[in-house]
Amino acid sequence: MQITSIAIVFFAAMGAVANPIARESDDLDARDVQLSKFGGECSLKHNTCTYLKGGKNHVVNCGSAANKKCKSDRHHCEYDEHHKRVDCQTPV
């Protein structure tokens, strides 16, 4: 009887140690991705997106395909710094 009790406690302890602990930073990772998007304005002449980050203007080239180019001058665009992508076709 005593060996059975010790075995149960031993296996319960092993199960507790073997299970991974859930990370709390999963929500923070999602928040960081959301905070890495910056809104800006398109330049039709240069086909670029200019956005403000940290008080400085940054310029990123839009795509050369028809569905990636700027629609019109001063049209809203969005740069995703996490994925390094620019979207010059975002609806306003």
Swiss-Prot record:
Induction of the gene: Expression is strongly induced under nutrient excess during the logarithmic growth phase, whereas it remains under the detection level in the supernatant of cultures grown under nutrient limitation.
UniProt organism field: Penicillium chrysogenum (Penicillium notatum)
Signal sequence bounds: 1-18
Proregion positions: 19-34
Keyword terms, alphabetized: Antimicrobial, Disulfide bond, Fungicide, Host cytoplasm, Secreted, Signal
TM helices/strands, residue ranges: none
Described function: Antifungal protein that acts as an inhibitor of growth of human pathogenic molds and yeasts. Is active against the model organism Neurospora crassa, the opportunistic human pathogens Aspergillus fumigatus, Trichophyton rubrum, and Aspergillus terreus. Provokes a reduction of the incidence of infections caused by Penicillium digitatum and Penicillium italicum in oranges and by Penicillium expansum in apples. Low doses of pafB have self-inhibition activity. Also shows activity against the model yeast Saccaromyces cerevisiae and the opportunistic human pathogen Candida albicans.
GO cellular component, one term: extracellular region
GO biological process, one term: killing of cells of another organism
Primary localization: secreted
Superkingdom of the organism of origin: Eukaryota
SUPFAM superfamilies linked: Antifungal protein (AGAFP)
Entry's family note: Belongs to the antifungal protein pafB family.
Disulfide bonds listed in the record: 42-70, 49-77, 62-88
Protein name: Antifungal protein B
Protein's cellular compartments: Secreted; Host cytoplasm
